[in-house]
Regions:
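Non-catalytic cap/lid and distal C-terminal segments of serine-dependent acyl enzymes
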Residues: 1-247
Length: 247
């Protein structure tokens, strides 16, 4: 497969930031790393090996972006407003700088595991016009986990379990007709993410948004051993057209 490394200057972040691409045809997938991890996380943990047949067949191509979670979501001793403001600058970098550079006008699928699964969902729900869908594995969708007892509008805007119940019919309609896949195990370290995923399922059902929520077994833990299998399964379904929605 064609693999390319990129480093560019972000106006929003006022720093250089990196990303890597895998493949060059098929449906584009924007991959967010898990908590505090980097753009090379999926490659280091065997995800590219699992997805290589689909990438080499031109069914999907991946753009793996970088994150700054360690300075924002994970910096629990920091000031709430400073942390979420920096996160929003990174969010704007993805929307205003990275996506225009890599999408070539295509609506991408947002994806990730754990914190990356949260980011994938958050980007999709805030900007559905940029995405054809989301594949979120073991995501946590409530900002209160990282910002306990928050009282901040910007944090609210980054907390899908809080803002989605207030979605207007027009907003909910923007989510329809897309590929929405959310998966979580029921094994070790999946209790909190499983509960969060279940709440998200209920909200989307009440909004009348068609989606696929798949809870795997009690032996399925919060790690790449299972995320590799889940990614292979769900992206395989997308490649086959078994779960495909027009953007």
């Amino acid at each position: 497969m064609k693999v390319e490394y990129h480093k560019h200057w972000s106006i929003n972040l006022n720093r250089e930031i990196e990303y890597k691409t895998y493949g060059e045809s098929g449906r584009g997938v924007l991959v967010f790393p898990s908590q505090d991890q980097r753009f090379y996380e999926w490659e280091d943990n065997g995800m590219m090996d699992i997805l290589a047949p689909m990438i080499e067949a031109g069914e999907i191509h991946l753009i793996c972006c970088d994150s700054i979670d360690a300075e924002t979501w994970s910096l629990t001793s920091g000031d709430y407003n400073e942390r979420i403001s920096l996160h929003e600058r990174w969010f704007n970098y993805i929307v205003d700088e990275l996506i225009p550079e890599v999408s070539h006008g295509e609506k991408l699928i947002a994806s990730g595991c754990s914190m990356g699964g949260y980011h994938a969902g958050n980007f999709f729900f805030r900007h559905p016009e940029l995405f054809s869908g989301v594949v979120s594995l073991s995501g946590l969708f409530h900002a209160d986990y990282f910002f306990p007892n928050y009282d901040n509008e910007l944090i609210y805007r980054n907390s899908p379990l809080d803002f989605l119940p207030n979605a207007t019919p027009m907003t909910a309609d923007r989510y329809r007709g897309k590929t929405l896949i959310f998966c979580c195990g029921q094994g070790n370290y999946e209790r909190v993410t499983g509960a969060s995923t279940g709440k998200l399922h209920g909200i989307l059902e009440r909004l009348g948004v068609d989606s696929w929520f798949d809870l795997w077994g009690k032996d399925v833990s919060h790690d790449f051993y299972w995320w590799r299998r889940q990614a292979q399964y769900f992206f395989g379904k997308i490649a086959e057209g078994a779960w495909r929605r027009a953007a």
